[in-house]
C-alpha cells in the first residue's frame, strides 16, 4: 500500500512551442514561465489523484489574483466498478489524458461523478465521453443541466441528492468496498455542488470547498504555516460570502462516521490536519453569519 508518485511535465515557451513531455520525479521539476505539469499519486485504498499543476496562473476568474498558481485535482476510485471524480481544465487536455490512460482503460470507466461544473473541473467531460459514451455522469440536477448546456452531446446520467448512495462494490484485490454517499452543498461556491464521501476509505471529495489556490508538488498539507494564508484568502473570496451555506454543509459532514482526508479540487489534499482546517471554516463562517467584520490580506 505504498504511495506511487510521479509527474509529467510540459513547458510552454514564450512562443508557445511545446517541449517534449517526459516522466520525471518531482525533484527534477524546474519552475519556468507558463509551466504546466501533472502529478499522480495513490493516496488511499484503490484511490488515486491526478493533479493538474498550473504553476504560473496569476488570476482566477475575476475575483482575485493568485500569488502561488493553482491546481485542478481529479480522482480515480477503483471498486468493483470504476469512478472518476471531476476532470480538469481544458488547457490540460493532452497531459491529463496521457496520465489517465496510463492508469485506466477508458472502456472500463463506469461513472463520472461531477462535483460541480465550473470549467476548471468539467473542461474535459466532453472529451472523456467521446472516449467512452457509456460512462454514466453522476451529479446534482443542476449539474447535469449545466453539462448538457456545455457539451451539447447526449450522455447517460444519474441524478443524486443528499443522503443517496452509489455503491461501487469491493475492489477485487484490496477487498475494500467503496460505497459513495452524496452530500448536497449548494452555493459552495456554485448552486450545483455536491460532496462525495467514500465509506471505504473515509475520504471526502469536496471540489472547491476547503481548497486553496496553491501550486506545489507537496501532495498533502504538510506545512500548515506555509499554506494558511492562501487557505484563508481562498475562503474569504469564495466561501465567506456564503457562510451560512458553509455551516449547513459542515453540519452534514459532522454526521459522517470518520473523516480521514478531504480531497479538495484545488491545492494540496487535507490529510495531516483535517480537523484544524474544518474548524477554521466553522469559526470563520460563524463569525460572518453573526455579522462580525474582518479583513483578509494576502
Pin down the residues of each PLM region.
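Conserved beta-strand hairpin/beta-sheet module of binuclear metal-dependent hydrolase folds
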Residues: 40-104, 195-198, 202-206, 296
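Acidic/His-rich, metal-assisted hydrolase cores and their charged scaffolds
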Residues: 21-37, 106, 241-245, 249-298
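Active-site neighborhood of phospho(di)ester-bond hydrolases with catalytic His/Asp-centered motifs
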Residues: 85-87, 109-117, 137-140, 204-208, ...
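N-terminal amphipathic/basic-hydrophobic helices that include classical n-h-c signal peptides
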Residues: 1-20
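Active-site metal-binding motif and surrounding structural segment of the metallo-beta-lactamase
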Residues: 80, 91-138
Amino acid at each position: 500500500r505504498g504511495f506511487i508518485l510521479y509527474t509529467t511535465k510540459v513547458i510552454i515557451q514564450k512562443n508557445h512551442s511545446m517541449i517534449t513531455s517526459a516522466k520525471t520525479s518531482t525533484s527534477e521539476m524546474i519552475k519556468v514561465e507558463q509551466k504546466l505539469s501533472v502529478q499522480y499519486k495513490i493516496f488511499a485504498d484503490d484511490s488515486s489523484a491526478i493533479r493538474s499543476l498550473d504553476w504560473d496562473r496569476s488570476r482566477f476568474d475575476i475575483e482575485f489574483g493568485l500569488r502561488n498558481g493553482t491546481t485542478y485535482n481529479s480522482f480515480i476510485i477503483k471498486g468493483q466498478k470504476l469512478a472518476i471524480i471531476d476532470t480538469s481544465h481544458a488547457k490540460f487536455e493532452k497531459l491529463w489524458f496521457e496520465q489517465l490512460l496510463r492508469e485506466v482503460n477508458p472502456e472500463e470507466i463506469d461513472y463520472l461523478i461531477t462535483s460541480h461544473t465550473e470549467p476548471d473541473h468539467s473542461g474535459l467531460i466532453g472529451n472523456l465521453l467521446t472516449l467512452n459514451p457509456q460512462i454514466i455522469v453522476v451529479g446534482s440536477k443542476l449539474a447535469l443541466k449545466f453539462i448538457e448546456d456545455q457539451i451539447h452531446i447526449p450522455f447517460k446520467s444519474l441524478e443524486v441528492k443528499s443522503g443517496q448512495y452509489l455503491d461501487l462494490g469491493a475492489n477485487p484485490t484490496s477487498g475494500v468496498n467503496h460505497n459513495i454517499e452524496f452530500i448536497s452543498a449548494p452555493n459552495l461556491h456554485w448552486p450545483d455542488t455536491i460532496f462525495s464521501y467514500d465509506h471505504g476509505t473515509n475520504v471526502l471529495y469536496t471540489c472547491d470547498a476547503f481548497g486553496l489556490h496553491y501550486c506545489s508538488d507537496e501532495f498533502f498539507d504538510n506545512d500548515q504555516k506555509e499554506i494558511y494564508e492562501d487557505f484563508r484568502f481562498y475562503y474569504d473570496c469564495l466561501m465567506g460570502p456564503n457562510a451560512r451555506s458553509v455551516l449547513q454543509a459542515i453540519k452534514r459532514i459532522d454526521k459522517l462516521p470518520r473523516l480521514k482526508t478531504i480531497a479538495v479540487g484545488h491545492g494540496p489534499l487535507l490529510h495531516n490536519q483535517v480537523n484544524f482546517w474544518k474548524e477554521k471554516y466553522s469559526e470563520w463562517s460563524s463569525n460572518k453569519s453573526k455579522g462580525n467584520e474582518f479583513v483578509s490580506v494576502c
